[in-house]
UniProtKB/Swiss-Prot annotation:
NCBIfam families: Na_transp (NF037979). The keyword Ligase does not apply. Putative sodium-dependent transporter. Disulfide bonds: none annotated. GO terms for cellular component: plasma membrane. Signal peptide: none annotated. This is Uncharacterized sodium-dependent transporter MJ1319. Keywords: Cell membrane, Membrane, Symport, Transmembrane, Transmembrane helix, Transport. Pfam families: SNF.
């Protein structure tokens, strides 16, 4: 088979699991529960479901439709919809590229912690051990410090796994890997949930997780948080889903696929919250630490609070720690391979390269950039760049995509394409949810955050460093335009 022939999924199940794998990431495990807890508890599920129905599913259908209609990755797909729009697809791909350059390092933290846990068990002081022994964090942004060689080697190992999966192609790589990773990941989370539910104090933690505060529904920030969580959780704006849908066969129910992927992703997040809060409830019960002092998100939860909680388990504490970090590694890798595939497929389409050559080119760039985040100041760099990459680049990429596909090409044309293939028919309402409601909300999210940064700065960093982080936005625009102007290099 010539490498110019487009690959395809061997089954719809493979496509579903790969799409779910792209959506389920580290944030589903360590961020969603905290979002629920801090935004009205069970009441948060109301704006969350509204966001899923009004933005999440409509935009996922849009990305599936673009990919399936054009049979191209994001840059050439948007160019096919409207001449001169290739750069908007590259903008999405570059956004994902920037995020992956440090996301893989976070996966490396999880992998390294997993190895340490298997060999040595839990550290006596998880906070000091993680920040000073593992990350070897420096005093600030100005102090780059040394390289954490354990993290560097782990980062290269993660890149090796990603390369191994993607080099095998769609059917034998992405599809087979996700058919193993996603069911196993679900199994690991169910183990953590079942264990959490048997612990004393667990119900108190779960009550904190789900008890509704309906007054939160009158706070617009809660609604914006719900829409932001849905948008980022479903891997929208990366160009991933466009690329994945381009590998679907001609007859594919795009609407059912979008609904299935969205519900599985959200269901996984909700389930993981029981594991997190049930275990934290137990820690509060045994140690006397108030639950509101124990609850945290992101890095603090994953590498400090949760290991401390698991170390207190009456039995098999190390085993459940291994299960937790193994789940993080699987969730991270399933997302990482999807974002890298968005870049690889775009290069294959644009430059007519073989998969292995395109993958080699992409990995070479990543291996040059990622080590920056393994230095002593790496966590600070990651924090600043992530704020602007995930908070600005992705929403802007999605807004550009919506303008091209819905308003310049025609939402009705894509709706007709979807309806020919799907049992659930889309009405005109879909065009307005995807084409009007979604960009308004995404613009509001970007505008409000920009207002906060302009008035209060970000994270206590000096203005110089915040501006430096924000420069990735114009940089992404410039590189996108350059890539559009580059010519195909056949047979390189």
């Amino acid at each position: 088979m010539s490498y110019m022939e487009r690959e395809s999924w061997s089954s719809n199940l493979g496509f579903i699991l790969a799409s779910v794998g792209s959506a389920i990431g580290l944030g589903n495990i360590w961020r969603f529960g905290y979002m629920v807890y801090t935004n009205g508890g069970g009441a948060f599920l109301i704006p969350y479901i509204v966001a899923l129905l009004c933005v999440g599913i409509p935009l996922m259908i849009l990305e599936f439709a673009i990919g399936h209609y054009t049979k191209k990755s994001a840059p050439l797909a948007l160019e096919k919809l409207h001449k001169g729009s290739e750069w908007t697809g590259w903008f999405a791909v570059i956004s994902g590229f920037i995020i992956t350059s440090y996301y893989v390092v976070i996966i490396a933290w999880c992998l390294y912690y997993l190895i340490i846990l298997v060999i040595y068990g839990y550290p006596s002081d998880p906070n000091a051990y993680f920040f000073h022994n593992i990350l070897q964090i420096s005093s600030g942004v100005e102090d780059i410090g040394g390289v954490s060689y354990g993290i560097l080697v782990s980062t290269l190992a993660v890149w090796g796994i990603v390369a191994l999966i993607l080099s095998a192609g769609i059917k034998n790589g992405l599809e087979k890997a996700n058919k193993i990773m996603i069911p196993f990941l679900l199994f690991l989370i169910i183990l953590l949930v079942l264990n959490a539910l048997t612990l004393p104090g667990a119900l108190t933690g779960i009550e904190w997780y789900l008890t509704p505060d309906f007054s939160a529904l009158f706070n617009y920030n809660v609604w914006l948080s719900a829409f932001s969580q849905i948008f980022f959780s479903l891997s929208l704006g990366f160009g991933i889903l466009i690329a994945y849908a381009s590998y679907l066969p001609k007859k594919s129910d795009l609407t059912i696929n979008a609904v299935t992927v969205s519900l599985l992703n959200c269901g996984f997040s909700f389930l993981a919250g029981f594991a997190v809060f049930g275990t934290l409830g137990y820690m509060s019960y045994t140690s006397g630490i108030p639950l509101d002092k124990a609850v945290s998100e992101g890095i603090g939860l994953a590498f400090v609070t949760f290991p401390k909680a698991l170390s207190l388990l009456p039995f098999a504490s190390r085993l459940f720690g291994i299960v937790f970090f193994l789940a993080l590694v699987f969730a991270g890798i399933s997302s990482a391979v999807s974002i890298v595939e968005a870049s690889v497929s775009a290069i294959i389409d644009k430059f007519s390269l073989s998969r292995k050559k395109a993958l080699l080119a992409v990995l070479a760039l990543f291996i040059i950039i990622s080590p920056i985040f393994t230095t002593g100041a790496g966590l600070y760099y990651l924090d600043i760049i992530d704020h602007f990459a995930s908070g600005y680049l992705l929403p802007i990429a999605a807004i550009l995509e919506i303008i091209i596909a819905i308003w310049l090409f025609g939402g009705d044309k894509l709706r007709e394409h979807v309806n020919k293939l799907s049992e659930i028919k889309l009405g005109v309402w879909w065009k307005y949810l995807a084409g009007v409601v979604s960009p308004i909300i995404l613009t509001a999210v970007v505008f409000l955050d920009a207002s906060n940064v302009l008035t209060s700065g970000y994270g206590g960093y000096k203005t110089t460093y915040v501006i430096f982080g924000a420069l990735i936005i114009p940089l992404a625009f410039v590189v996108s335009v350059i890539l559009q102007k580059m010519k195909t290099i056949k047979g390189w």
